[in-house]
């Protein structure tokens, strides 16, 4: 068996068959072809890139390859589409065209290698395939290398006479399509060992084993190698700890040239007794069974002899005929089954040295993809958001987020999706199918992700940890929502009123206020709620129920959130930090209110006078000025206040308590605000400045009174004579004049 070529793993479609494929199936075809090509590249089996791969990477139709003038020449990279174009009339012309393009006016007889080669015409060879013999006077391996790398001699069968051993090697590059002979045609024969080789580069490497030429050194295994292409292949095989040994000569080779023997793993064909030592050759072998039969496809009423057509039938019927014997999973493609079966259940033999990631699949393709992620090589990048992907198909699906395209539509409800897998999952809602079952409790789920999340309830594992507060979650979505508590992000905005929310579910519930849909009303006060749980919590206000109790101090709360905030008093935790000044708070509402000191936002407005406030509590207290309400009454003297803080400060006048002391002069005060304003006498600070005249004051009340001199406002009116004043102190002083008159 020869070296695996791109043609061996390529899938062919006729033009008629290609036109019947859906866009998703074409994308699948392109991904499979590109992935097969990358597999060959990772194993060092491809010399240069086929035309078909170039077109597929540019997301062009494969049939556009036929419109190109340039024809692929070398057989191991020969495009199976361009091959059809090489008829007897065009082969010689195409060959001459390639020669002239690369070497100017030089013809076949005047190549730059002619100093080392003698050209002898072989008699009896006519037609397109011009058989020529080259006698090698002085062997130079670099000449052979350049000869084949330039792809000059690929279209004609050649013979090479090696003077040192007087052995003749023949090479044929074109496949006789009518007779279906082997793609490689004639073999290279090395008489000294009677071993057949498929390509001259392999012959040269084998020759070097006997000659003893070893020019390339491997740093990993301290081995010396025979050819320039060997180090790459050797390092890959050394990395995977796989070597192939020739039993006849007991020489170790890094390419599978002769009898292959894989030490770690083998792949057995389900349809015959064939055992392959490489996954790619196992895939190649399976195509033999497909080509041996002809499948009848009733939908198009034609016989299909290619595996691609059989796959089309399977796609139409939604069949999954390939079943895994180990886990019972069914797949619609033999390739998928093969890849699925070679995944070990426990061991992870492949580890990428850059990031330390371990892979289940013992294949260099997965290491190549991880290398692309780490190094940024060969990634497909989105032009809209610069996000990168290792597969072009993933990029195409991602771009639908920006374009809004949703090509996959549900026939039951008409809902559309941008990805076929989303549609498959959605269909389970209608069918009730739940293929993912928990082994612990037997509960079934329609998505594998739901099963994975459910299994954490049994293990108690919480993989997702917050970097700010170290809180852990079983679901990544819960962590994302939690992180918005720290960042203050509220991405969900109501189009009706502009209110923002941190969760989409909260926005959905809020919208019901505007639509009036399914509102839950309190039987006591008729207050409506969009969520039933919110109604239950609200009813505790009327019942006085406080089910959440603090274990530290025994204090009870009607809401769990209040208990959580209360716990932070005991722990001293302040997880909410202001980015502007680094001040921390124990609850998110405190941070939200604090931010308004930086932004100057005042969202709460008094309906009576239009005055705006940063805090809702301030506007509530302010309204009491208009209503005259003073709900806070001193039990000692009966004096009432419209602020609770005023009552607290007043009560200290009865107790004599003065907890706030000035460090400069030792003077004590019964209010924190009094101490703050007192300190300005020592510092000379006057933070309150008039916008009209620029005059500054050390007290806010002084600035408020001063502004009334500009506006003419006099809110304090004497009930005796009707005289008005702009300051309360002026009114009090004026009222004393009336009391003196009475005395």
Swiss-Prot record:
Cross-link (Glycyl lysine isopeptide (Lys-Gly) (interchain with G-Cter in SUMO2)): 66, 135
GO biological process: regulation of transcription by RNA polymerase II
Pfam families, alphabetized: KRAB, zf-C2H2
Single GO term (MF): zinc ion binding
Gene Ontology terms: cellular component: nucleus
Main location class: nucleus
Keyword Metal-binding belongs to the record: yes
Domain KRAB per the UniProt entry, residue ranges: 4-75
Residue spans, zinc finger C2H2-type: 267-289, 322-340, 380-402, 408-430, 436-458, 464-486, 492-514, 520-542, 548-570, 576-598, 604-626, 632-654, 660-682, 688-710, 716-738
Name of the protein described by the UniProt record: Zinc finger protein 267
Species name: Homo sapiens (Human)
Gene symbol of the encoding locus: ZNF267
């Amino acid at each position: 068996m020869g070296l695996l070529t791109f043609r061996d793993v390529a899938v062919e479609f006729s033009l008629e068959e290609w036109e019947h494929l859906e866009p998703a199936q074409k994308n699948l075809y392109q991904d499979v072809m590109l992935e097969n090509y990358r597999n060959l590249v990772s194993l060092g089996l491809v010399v240069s890139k086929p035309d078909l791969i170039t077109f597929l990477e540019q997301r062009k139709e494969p049939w556009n390859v036929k419109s190109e003038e340039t024809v692929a020449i070398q057989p191991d990279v020969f495009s199976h589409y361009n091959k059809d174009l090489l008829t007897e009339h065009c082969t010689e012309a195409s060959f001459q065209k390639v020669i002239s393009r690369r070497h100017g006016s030089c013809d076949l007889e005047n190549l730059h290698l002619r100093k080392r080669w003698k050209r002898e015409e072989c008699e009896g060879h006519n037609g397109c395939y011009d058989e020529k013999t080259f006698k090698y006077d002085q062997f130079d391996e670099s000449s052979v290398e350049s000869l084949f790398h330039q792809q000059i001699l690929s279209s004609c069968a050649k013979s090479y006479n090696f003077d040192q051993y007087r052995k003749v090697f023949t090479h044929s590059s074109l496949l006789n399509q009518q007779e279906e002979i082997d793609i490689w045609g004639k073999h290279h024969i090395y008489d000294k060992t009677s071993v057949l080789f498929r390509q001259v580069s392999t012959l040269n490497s084998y020759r070097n084993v006997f000659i003893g030429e070893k020019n390339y050194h491997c740093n990993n295994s301290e081995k010396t190698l025979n050819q320039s292409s060997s180090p790459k292949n050797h390092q890959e095989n050394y990395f995977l700890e796989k070597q192939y040994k020739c039993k006849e000569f007991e020489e170790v080779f890094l390419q599978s040239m002769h009898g292959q023997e894989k030490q770690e793993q083998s792949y057995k064909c389900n349809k015959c007794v064939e055992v392959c030592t490489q996954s790619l050759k196992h895939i190649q072998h399976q195509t033999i069974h497909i080509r041996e039969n002809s499948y009848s496809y009733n939908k198009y009423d034609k016989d299909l002899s290619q595996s691609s057509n059989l796959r089309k039938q399977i796609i139409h019927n939604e069949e999954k005929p390939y079943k895994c014997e180990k886990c019972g999973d069914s797949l619609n493609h033999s390739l998928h089954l093969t890849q699925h079966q070679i995944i070990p259940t426990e061991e992870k033999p492949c580890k990428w040295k850059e990031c330390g990631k371990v892979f289940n699949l013992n294949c260099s393709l997965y290491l190549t993809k991880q290398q692309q992620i780490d190094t940024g090589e060969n990634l497909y990048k989105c032009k809209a958001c610069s996000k990168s992907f290792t597969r072009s198909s993933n990029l195409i699906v991602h771009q639908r987020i920006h374009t809004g395209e949703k090509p996959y539509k549900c026939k039951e409800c008409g809902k559309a999706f941008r990805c076929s897998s989303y549609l498959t999952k959605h269909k389970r809602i209608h069918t009730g199918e739940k293929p993912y079952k928990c082994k612990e409790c037997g509960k079934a789920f329609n998505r594998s992700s739901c099963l994975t999340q459910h299994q954490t309830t049994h293990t108690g594992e919480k993989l997702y940890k917050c970097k700010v507060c170290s809180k852990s979650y079983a679901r990544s979505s819960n962590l994302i929502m939690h992180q918005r508590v720290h960042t203050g992000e509220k991405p969900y905005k109501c189009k009706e009123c502009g209110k923002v929310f941190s969760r989409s579910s909260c926005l959905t519930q809020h919208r019901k206020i505007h639509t009036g849909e399914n509102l839950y009303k309190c039987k006591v006060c008729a207050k409506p709620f969009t969520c039933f749980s919110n109604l239950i919590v609200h009813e505790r206000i009327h019942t006085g129920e406080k089910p959440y109790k603090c274990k530290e101090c025994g204090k009870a709360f009607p809401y769990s959130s209040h208990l959580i905030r209360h716990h932070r008093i005991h722990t001293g935790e302040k997880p909410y930090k202001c980015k502007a000044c680094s001040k921390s708070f124990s609850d998110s509402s405190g941070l939200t209110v604090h931010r308004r000191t930086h932004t100057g936002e005042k969202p709460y407005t008094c309906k009576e006078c239009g005055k705006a406030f940063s805090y809702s509590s301030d506007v509530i207290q302010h309204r009491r000025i208009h209503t005259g309400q003073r709900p806070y009454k001193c039990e000692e003297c009966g004096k009432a206040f419209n602020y609770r803080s005023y009552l607290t400060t007043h009560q200290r006048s009865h107790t004599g308590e003065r907890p706030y002391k000035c460090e400069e002069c030792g003077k004590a005060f019964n209010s924190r605000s009094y101490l703050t304003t007192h300190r300005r006498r020592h510092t000379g600070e006057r933070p309150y400045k008039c916008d009209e005249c620029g005059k500054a004051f050390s007290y806010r009340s002084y600035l408020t009174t001063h502004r009334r001199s500009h506006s003419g406002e006099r809110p304090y009116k004497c009930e005796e004579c009707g005289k008005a004043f702009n300051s309360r102190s002026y009114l009090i002083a004026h009222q004393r004049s009336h009391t003196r008159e009475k005395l």
